[in-house]
């Protein structure tokens, strides 16, 4: 009887093992093919109406839909996780306190001063040229530099060509820029550019700029049309000069340790959705710019379009500075963005 009972026990165990091998469930109870259940955090510097936050929201919606709700992304605009401090926000994505982020290259300069090479003045003619260069050799440069800081590059989208607004007077010549107190990101490119024009550039957190202009601490700011609109600069600035002096990308990034801890299937999903969100962001920003400029006019801003001769005068005024930037970033970095240094 004992021998017969032992045989029955072995048979039952074998049957359990056979059935478990044929089950559609994985070890953690998920059905085969389901995504892991995880919530990720994503930080952006802009307000919820700015392009970086909109791209992040678009990305989060794609991820949740395609994962069946298993993978979710909580988006935090205004660098809420870092109390509005962009530099601290970047430290958090680098350390893994935040999982995902999107920051402009000039903002990322706090951890790698060689990242914003593509912001050197007047190196791209238009958005199409910028995309062609970045999506060929530029992205490899970004990926390599970010990897050294513990971050994984997932894509880029337009922050926009930077324009100039101020509350003092119309700007048509280099002399018009002299002595203007202009807010710039803390980047060697922007600080140096406005110094070369004789302005008084000041680095300041973006969240403080509107009030500083309102109070007269600043005369103006330089940024893309989209950010200028979403921040309602038309309420405190009377003049806009369209000069496309610098192209800026936002880089979509993940903390590398967090990224490598994810299942391959989840990585594939996030990479796919990030790529689509970046494409959407590029298209959206370009499509909205013309209407936004018309809105500025309706709000009472004087919008100035520079002639070719006026543009040439600005380029001549900063020619020596541009060469300094070519030398600063180096031949390899410049070559990655099609710059003949």
Locate each region found by the language model.
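Bacterial N-terminal signal peptides that target proteins for export
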Residues: 1-9
């Amino acid at each position: 009887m004992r021998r017969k009972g032992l045989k029955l026990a072995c048979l039952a165990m074998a049957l359990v093992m056979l059935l478990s091998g044929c089950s559609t469930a994985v070890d953690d109870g998920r059905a085969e093919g389901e995504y892991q259940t995880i919530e990720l955090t994503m930080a952006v510097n802009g307000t919820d109406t700015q392009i970086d936050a909109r791209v992040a929201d678009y990305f989060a919606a794609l991820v949740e839909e395609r994962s069946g709700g298993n993978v979710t992304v909580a988006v935090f605009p205004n660098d809420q996780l870092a109390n509005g401090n962009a530099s601290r926000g970047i430290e958090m994505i680098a350390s893994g306190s935040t999982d995902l982020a999107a920051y402009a290259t000039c903002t990322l300069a706090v951890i790698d001063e060689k990242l914003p090479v593509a912001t050197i003045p007047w190196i791209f003619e238009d958005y199409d040229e910028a995309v062609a260069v970045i999506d060929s050799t530029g992205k490899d440069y970004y990926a390599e530099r970010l990897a050294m800081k513990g971050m994984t590059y997932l894509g880029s989208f337009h922050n926009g060509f930077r324009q100039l607004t101020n509350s003092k007077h119309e700007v048509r010549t280099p002399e018009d820029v002299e002595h203007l107190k202009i807010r710039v990101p803390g980047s060697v490119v922007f600080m140096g550019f406005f110094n070369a024009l004789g302005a008084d550039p000041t680095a300041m957190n973006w969240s403080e700029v509107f009030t500083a202009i309102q109070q007269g601490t600043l005369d103006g700011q330089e940024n893309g049309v989209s950010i200028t609109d979403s921040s309602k600069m038309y309420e405190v600035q009377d003049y806009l000069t369209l000069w496309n002096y610098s192209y800026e990308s936002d880089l979509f990034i993940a903390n590398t340790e967090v990224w490598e801890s994810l299942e391959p299937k989840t990585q594939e999903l996030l990479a796919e959705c990030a790529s689509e969100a970046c494409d959407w962001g590029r298209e959206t920003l370009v499509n909205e710019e013309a209407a936004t400029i018309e809105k500025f006019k309706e709000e009472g801003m004087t919008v100035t379009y520079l002639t070719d001769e006026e543009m040439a005068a600005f380029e001549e005024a900063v020619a020596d500075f541009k060469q300094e930037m070519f030398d600063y970033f180096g031949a390899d970095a410049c070559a990655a963005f099609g710059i003949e240094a």
